[in-house]
């Protein structure tokens, strides 16, 4: 039996199939952890969703920002729905859309397996969040998303503010939690997120840190696997395992076996698309980062 965590698929169906062949995935005994962003940009989002849906008894999914955006589209007017990109439009107009999208909406924001000592989240955790606190806050939003009033959440979740505070309530609280779990790359020690900084460490605004390098962050009792940050590339450091390696931007699709003492890595080539350049001018010297070799 093996447990493999897989980075952002982003509609790269062919690459996903090749990766499953590469790791010799056996649904009778193996489990897949998908780090979110199953859809968008890759051109085969419908096929990718159908594939992951077919593996639902043998996999765990956490939602990414693109998955939530797709769900948000479904509660808009038909006229607005027709304005989405062709890849997502194929999902919205598919005969099995209700089954697939209902299943997608029922997925988690965080997955924890304390037996093996791992947590999976799409983007990251706020500096002061313990793993237990992150689970609790994620569950707050999951209850809304899985409930009958989910449309209210999907209508109100967009926006860069407010920054997280325990005193928040209502829509503002849910939005802040979603932004941390699905959109964060850089933040301040107080937890304020930068949504503009998307490049590699060293290109960010002064005062911003990669979320896993923020001074004074709490110690965490679980190893974390995440995706979302394609320009960061494969990064294993300080208990963080970032595995979005830009499959949709001409990079690779990555799988990481996490249930063994020695981590195993598998990769296949993604699409041949140039990654967008982020030209934010550096305002501070980047802190040197040390990657740990897989143990």
From Swiss-Prot:
The keyword Hydrolase applies. CDD domains: MPP_ApaH. One of its GO terms (molecular function) is bis(5'-nucleosyl)-tetraphosphatase (symmetrical) activity. It comes from the Bacteria. Keywords: Hydrolase. Residues 271-295 are annotated as: Disordered. It is an enzyme of class 3 (hydrolase). Hydrolyzes diadenosine 5',5'''-P1,P4-tetraphosphate to yield ADP. This is Bis(5'-nucleosyl)-tetraphosphatase, symmetrical. The gene is apaH.
């Amino acid at each position: 039996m093996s447990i493999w965590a897989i980075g952002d698929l982003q509609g790269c169906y062919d690459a996903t199939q090749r990766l499953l062949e590469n790791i010799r995935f056996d649904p009778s005994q193996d489990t897949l952890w998908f780090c979110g962003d199953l859809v968008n940009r890759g051109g085969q989002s419908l096929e990718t969703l159908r594939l992951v849906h077919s593996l639902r008894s043998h996999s765990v999914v956490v939602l990414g920002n693109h998955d939530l955006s797709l769900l948000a589209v479904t509660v808009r007017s038909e006229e607005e729905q027709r304005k989405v990109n062709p890849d997502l439009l194929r999902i919205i107009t598919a005969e099995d859309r209700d089954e697939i999208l209902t299943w997608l909406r029922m997925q988690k924001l965080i997955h924890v397996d304390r037996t093996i000592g791992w947590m999976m989240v799409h983007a990251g955790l706020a500096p002061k969040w313990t793993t237990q606190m992150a689970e609790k806050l994620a569950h707050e939003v999951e209850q809304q998303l899985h409930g009958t009033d989910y449309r209210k959440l999907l209508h109100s979740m967009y926006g860069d503010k407010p920054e997280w505070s325990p005193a928040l309530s209502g829509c503002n609280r849910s939005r802040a939690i979603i932004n941390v779990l699905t959109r964060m790359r850089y933040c301040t020690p107080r937890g304020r997120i930068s949504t503009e900084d998307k490049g590699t460490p060293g290109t960010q605004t002064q005062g911003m840190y990669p979320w896993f390098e923020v001074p004074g962050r709490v110690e965490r009792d679980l190893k974390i696997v995440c995706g979302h940050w394609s320009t960061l590339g494969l990064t294993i450091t300080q208990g963080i395992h970032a595995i979005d390696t830009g499959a949709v931007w001409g990079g690779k699709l990555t799988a990481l076996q996490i249930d063994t003492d020695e981590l195993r890595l598998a990769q296949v080539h993604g699409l041949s698309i140039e990654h967008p350049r982020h030209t934010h001018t550096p305002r501070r010297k980047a802190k040197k980062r040390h990657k740990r070799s897989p143990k």
